[in-house]
Amino acid sequence: MFGADKGTADKLDGKKLHIGIVQARFNENITNTLAAACRAELLRLGVQEKHIRHVLVPGALEVPVALQALAERDEYDALIALGCIIRGETYHFELVANESGAGVTRLALDYQVPIANAIITTENLDQALARQTEKGVDAARVAVEMANLLEELS
């Protein structure tokens, strides 16, 4: 929802955090902007450049596999999934959107690591372009907030 009230978070301090980013290359013009906005926001929140691991995969269905590999290393306080799925003329859109989303959620629960899911799903390119920067920033903020929350709860 564009312009939705996302509330205010108190603990957006990333100074001590290690963050892993997995970016799908499919629709690369969009995902590159997502990644740039995400990285810039992580740095603004205090995450050190050397504590950000950024890997690329072919598409959204491969994102969970790379997230799992990072989660298994147990080196990251939070992970971020970046991708862009634009509806086409076939059922493939639903398949990719549902399976990638379910995979990301399952990994977060199985590994007890926060994963900010910014695999955006849109009806068309214009919607993707309108969301690419904001969703990258949101993903960084979610990752930092949830990493801090889980640290507080442990």
From Swiss-Prot:
GO cellular component: cytosol; riboflavin synthase complex
Catalytic reaction list: (2S)-2-hydroxy-3-oxobutyl phosphate + 5-amino-6-(D-ribitylamino)uracil = 6,7-dimethyl-8-(1-D-ribityl)lumazine + phosphate + 2 H2O + H(+)
Protein name in UniProt: 6,7-dimethyl-8-ribityllumazine synthase
Entries under NCBIfam families matching the protein: lumazine-synth
Record-listed 5-amino-6-(D-ribitylamino)uracil binding positions: F26, A60, L61, E62, C84, I85, I86, N117
InterPro entries: LS, LS/RS, LS/RS_sf
GO biological process terms held by the UniProt record: riboflavin biosynthetic process
Family from the record: Belongs to the DMRL synthase family.
EC top class, as a word: transferase
EC number annotated for this UniProt entry: 2.5.1.78
Pathway(s) annotated for this protein in UniProt: Cofactor biosynthesis; riboflavin biosynthesis; riboflavin from 2-hydroxy-3-oxobutyl phosphate and 5-amino-6-(D-ribitylamino)uracil: step 1/2
Binding site for (2S)-2-hydroxy-3-oxobutyl phosphate: E89, T90, R131
SUPFAM superfamilies: Lumazine synthase
Species of the source: Acidovorax ebreus (strain TPSY) (Diaphorobacter sp. (strain TPSY))
Keyword annotations of the record: Riboflavin biosynthesis, Transferase
Active site: H92
GO molecular function: 6,7-dimethyl-8-ribityllumazine synthase activity
Role: Catalyzes the formation of 6,7-dimethyl-8-ribityllumazine by condensation of 5-amino-6-(D-ribitylamino)uracil with 3,4-dihydroxy-2-butanone 4-phosphate. This is the penultimate step in the biosynthesis of riboflavin.
